Amino acid sequence: MATSVEYETLYTGQKMPLIGLGTWKSAPGQVKDAVKYALGVGYRHIDCAFVYGNETEVGEAIKESVGPDKGLKREEVFVTSKLWNNKHHPDDVECALRKTLQELQLDYLDLYLMHWPYAFKRGDQVFPQNPDGSVQYDLTDYKDTWKAMEKLVEKGLAKAIGLSNFNKRQMDDILSIATVKPAVLQVECHPYLAQNELIACCRSHGLVLTGYSPLGSPDRSWRKPEDPVLLEEPGIIAMAKKYNISEAQILLRWQVQRRVVTIPKSVTPARILQNLQVFDFSLSEEEMQLIGALNKNWRYIIPLITVNGKSVPRDAGHPLYPFNDPY
C-alpha cells in the first residue's frame, strides 16, 4: 500500500511533496528501477538534473509508471530538473529545457531550477576546462539567464522556476528584477547546516526551501576520515532507538516538521520506502531543538576539481561563488 505524503504549496498553487526522490549520484542501470519503485510505493516528487547524466532512464521509469491505464496521472507527479552552467546564455535556455523534456519524455516540468549562479563557457562540454584543469567560465549574468527562464513559464514548458545554490544576496538580486518570481530555493540542508536564516528569508518572500543531502551525503566520494558523520550522532541514534526507526528517518522527520522539502537519494528499495515513512509520528519540541542545536554551518557539498595535480574547490575563486557569504 502506498504511503501518503504531505505537501508544501508553492505561490503558484502547485502542491510540492515534502519528500522527493533525489537522483544525484544514482548510476545509470540503477536509477530506472529506483524511480519505478519509488512511484509504486507512494513518492510523488522526483528531483532530477541534466548534469546527473541519468535523465533518459528517469524518463523511462516515469513513462512506464505514469499515464492512462498506469494508475498515476501526470499531474499527480511533481518533477524538477535543473539548467546546467554551460547553458546560461539566454539563447541556450529554452533548448536546454527542451533537451531535458525530451530525455524525461515529458511535455512540461513542474519546476525548473538554475543549478548554480555562475555560467560555464557556452557549448556542449558539461565541464569545459583550461589546460591546467580549471573551469572555463562565461560572463553571462544570472539575471539575464533568469529572464530567459521566465519565458519558459509563459510558454507552458515549466509550471514554476526557481534557484539552486544561490545565497541570500543573489536571491534578492533575482527577486529585484523578476517578473515571474522564483518559487523554490534548493540548497544543502541538514542538522549540521540548518539554514535557519535562509529559510526565514525564503518564507518572507514566499519561496519554499528544498534541502538536498539531508542525510549528510554519506556516499560522497570525497569524504575524509575526520569529517563529522550525521548518522553517527549519539542524540540521533538515541532518538532512532526510542521510536524504533532509522537514524535517516529521524533526520528526515526533523525537516518535514520544519516544513522543509527534502530529496534523499537512494537506489535501495528498503531505504527508498523507509525514507517516505516519516509522516506517522512527530518529534517533541525538545527533540526538535536538540537536533537543531547540532548546527555548525558545516557544508559537505563543495564541488572539487584537480588543478595542476591538486584537489581544490572548483569555483571558489569565482566572483559569484555563493558560499563565501554567511548564508
Curated annotation (Swiss-Prot):
GO terms for biological process: aldehyde catabolic process; cellular detoxification of aldehyde; lipid metabolic process. The keyword Cell membrane applies. One of its GO terms (molecular function) is aldose reductase (NADPH) activity. The keyword Coiled coil does not apply. NADP(+) binds at residues 13-24, 47, 164-165, 213, 215, 217, 265-268, 271, 274-275. Coiled coil: none annotated. Gene3D superfamilies: NADP-dependent oxidoreductase domain (3.20.20.100). Pfam families: Aldo_ket_red (PF00248). It is an enzyme of class 1 (oxidoreductase). Keywords: Cell membrane, Cytoplasm, Lipid metabolism, Membrane, NADP, Oxidoreductase. One of its GO terms (cellular component) is cytosol. The record marks 82 as: Lowers pKa of active site Tyr. It catalyses: a primary alcohol + NADP(+) = an aldehyde + NADPH + H(+); S-nitroso-CoA + NADPH + H(+) = sulfinamide-CoA + NADP(+); S-nitrosoglutathione + NADPH + H(+) = S-(hydroxysulfenamide)glutathione + NADP(+). It is found in: Cytoplasm, Cytosol; Apical cell membrane. It comes from the Eukaryota. Its EC number is 1.1.1.2, 1.6.-.-. The active site is at 52 (proton donor). Its main location: cytoplasm. PROSITE patterns: ALDOKETO_REDUCTASE_1, ALDOKETO_REDUCTASE_2, ALDOKETO_REDUCTASE_3. Catalyzes the NADPH-dependent reduction of a wide variety of carbonyl-containing compounds to their corresponding alcohols. Displays enzymatic activity towards endogenous metabolites such as aromatic and aliphatic aldehydes, ketones, monosaccharides and bile acids. Acts as an aldehyde-detoxification enzyme. Also acts as an inhibitor of protein S-nitrosylation by mediating degradation of S-nitroso-coenzyme A (S-nitroso-CoA), a cofactor required to S-nitrosylate proteins. Also acts as a S-nitroso-glutathione reductase by catalyzing the NADPH-dependent reduction of S-nitrosoglutathione. PANTHER family: ALDO/KETO REDUCTASE (PTHR11732). Belongs to the aldo/keto reductase family. This is Aldo-keto reductase family 1 member A1.
